[in-house]
């Protein structure tokens, strides 16, 4: 019997997997993009581990006429500029990627969104893999985040995060950032092609399985695209880019992909001492 492979080659651009190194990716046609990474081996879940999303459920087809659309499936963020770019607010169970240069204000924007949503009665869980709780608290105080329904967690293990989401049952989850997250059954480093792909896949299952909206923060490369495999943008429902010059106060938010709205809208913000304000 053939021995199972311990490593494989992944295209950094599109995530294509190959048993051997290739000069050109047969899918995205880019050159010299393959990196060797460990292959995830199937593991039996240990006793007490959180079950996979949707495990044990029976798949039953539903007629389209039986599917109801409720206006409450969209939630205003408290920012009219953001709501317009999203297409009239947040869609329940959606997975939204927010990309931008480090330090441009992605975390500040989402922390203010958390404040608005929690103030409106939503249960919000902000998960940081880059800052300590004290650092988040300092930033939260600066922008006036004092509401009670806003939970914070410093964690990078997505299997642990899965359990925390299942127990706390939030309406909205923020993952800051996807490049710091990892799956236990993937032996490559956080931020690698396989880690980013599998981490996003689990977050997608959580969003759809629990009906929770998840925002993923992603840093961009010098080429201006989200770091990690391009397949990441194909997996999520919405891709937003937060752009601007760190030496200038103005920021622009635009959608390059949106399954629930237009990609022709932009939102304009101004960075002030106490956070972002709409223009």
Regions found by a protein language model. Give the residues of each.
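Substrate-engagement module of ASCE P-loop NTPases
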Residues: 194-219, 235-246
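Conserved P-loop NTPase
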Residues: 26-30, 34, 40-64, 68, ...
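Short cysteine-rich clusters marking metal-coordination/redox-active sites
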Residues: 11-14, 25-28
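Loop/turn-to-beta-strand initiation segments
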Residues: 123, 149, 169-172, 210-215
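Short glycine-rich substrate-engagement loop in P-loop NTPases that contacts/grips substrate
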Residues: 79, 140-167
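Flexible beta-alpha connector loops of hexameric P-loop NTPases
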Residues: 71-72, 99, 148-155, 183-197
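Short metal-coordination and nucleic-acid-contact micro-motifs, chiefly zinc-binding Cys/His arrays
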Residues: 5-7, 21-24
